[in-house]
Amino acid sequence: MTYNLHPAILVLKDGKFYRGWTLINSIISFGEVVFNTGMTGYQEIMTDPSYAEQIITFTYPEIGNTGINHEDNESNKIHVKGIITKNICFSPNNWRQQESFINYIFNNQIPHIFGIDTRALTKHLRKTGSMNGCISSQYLNPYLLSTKFKDRLSIESSDLVKQVTTSKNYEFQGYSHKHFSYLQYKTDKMYGYGLKIILIDFGVKYNILSRLDNYGCSIQILPATSSYETINAYNPDGIILSNGPGDPSIITYAIKTVKKIIKYTNIPIFGICMGHQIISLALEGTTFKLKFGHRGLNHPAGMKQKAEVTSQNHGFAVNQESLYKDTINITHFNLNDTTVAGILHNKKPIFSVQYHPEASPGPHDSDYLFKYFINLIKHFKQYKNYKNSSLAQAR
């Protein structure tokens, strides 16, 4: 298939603009412009619900080299508002490839622009912070496009979770296709067999479900708006609070629900990314917006002399000073900027991390946390009490 190139423009809210090319004529798309430093994983990133309402700048200069397959999607649709690249590979080659990247973006009409200086753009975003922007091939006048930002809501004032959460309760039955995972061949399917896990869906990635399924857990997925009474009626052995997009402080309904779960039950809880922030807010902590966020596959997280290389994708973080030391232990810091990356409750079986142990894309250093969660559930079911233990001991 042959494609025509059309001139396109990226305009930022501060007036900065970049000209490039697109394969789609007459597009216009608004979103928060952010950058991801990963060399791979573009398919997982575009289908990750945590990227809702965002335009992603890929800092790696060549995107699309390994094509697209039908197994690596992290949800059932594309969530990004657009993508920005230096170059797009027109001749990909990979043994798992089922479609070229250019076919994928053209067939799905994904707003995009390429041929711009992504290094200069990334340096600008690092200096000024993430901001709203627009990709357009419909209008090419930057001053005209600048006037269209007035009615655009910021990430901080939008409840993005309600856009991506499931609309109904359902039980995870595995995938109709084979969801590829290197780790599925190294997991004991009987290790968590029979355990009832409730997952609160703030924008869950498929691989979180896949990792739990690989351990043999029974997984019930509930909407983010589920009440304490609804969750408790399932009598779960454990609860996972998933990843998700946007500002966690806006998700007041979930914060209130988690606060009740913590107060009235001793159910083990594991929070991932947005789930980590929701737990912190339920424990009277606060969050703040990062200048340009953490989005990449090689963020070091740890404490003292031991660190994990982690996959991260968030624009908000927990304020360390807001956490009560008599209630919460900080287990991990982001070693790039010392923001809180993991916490452990002192008196209840609750822990959370500000990164993605399921990877997809990214390293597997923190995959042990799923097994730790299962061990926590087993311990509580057997002894009916919680003995505080270091996360490091679970490796």
UniProtKB/Swiss-Prot annotation:
It holds the Pfam family GATase. PROSITE patterns: GATASE_TYPE_1. The active site is at C273, H356, E358. Keywords: Amino-acid biosynthesis, Arginine biosynthesis, ATP-binding, Chloroplast, Glutamine amidotransferase, Ligase, Nucleotide-binding, Plastid, Pyrimidine biosynthesis. Transmembrane segments: none annotated. CDD domains: GATase1_CPSase. L-glutamine binds at S50, G244, G246, M274, Q277, N313, G315, F316. Pathway: Amino-acid biosynthesis; L-arginine biosynthesis; carbamoyl phosphate from bicarbonate: step 1/1; Pyrimidine metabolism; UMP biosynthesis via de novo pathway; (S)-dihydroorotate from bicarbonate: step 1/3. It is found in: Plastid, Chloroplast. Residues 1-192 are annotated as: CPSase. The keyword Nucleus does not apply. The keyword Chloroplast applies. Its main location: plastid. It catalyses: hydrogencarbonate + L-glutamine + 2 ATP + H2O = carbamoyl phosphate + L-glutamate + 2 ADP + phosphate + 2 H(+). Residues 196-383 form the Glutamine amidotransferase type-1 domain. It is an enzyme of class 6 (ligase). Signal peptide: none annotated. GO terms for biological process: 'de novo' pyrimidine nucleobase biosynthetic process; 'de novo' UMP biosynthetic process; glutamine metabolic process; L-arginine biosynthetic process. NCBIfam families: CPSaseIIsmall, PRK12838.1. Composed of two chains; the small (or glutamine) chain promotes the hydrolysis of glutamine to ammonia, which is used by the large (or ammonia) chain to synthesize carbamoyl phosphate. Tetramer of heterodimers (alpha,beta)4. Belongs to the CarA family. Small subunit of the glutamine-dependent carbamoyl phosphate synthetase (CPSase). CPSase catalyzes the formation of carbamoyl phosphate from the ammonia moiety of glutamine, carbonate, and phosphate donated by ATP, constituting the first step of 2 biosynthetic pathways, one leading to arginine and/or urea and the other to pyrimidine nucleotides. The small subunit (glutamine amidotransferase) binds and cleaves glutamine to supply the large subunit with the substrate ammonia. This is Carbamoyl phosphate synthase small chain. It comes from Gracilaria tenuistipitata var. liui (Red alga).
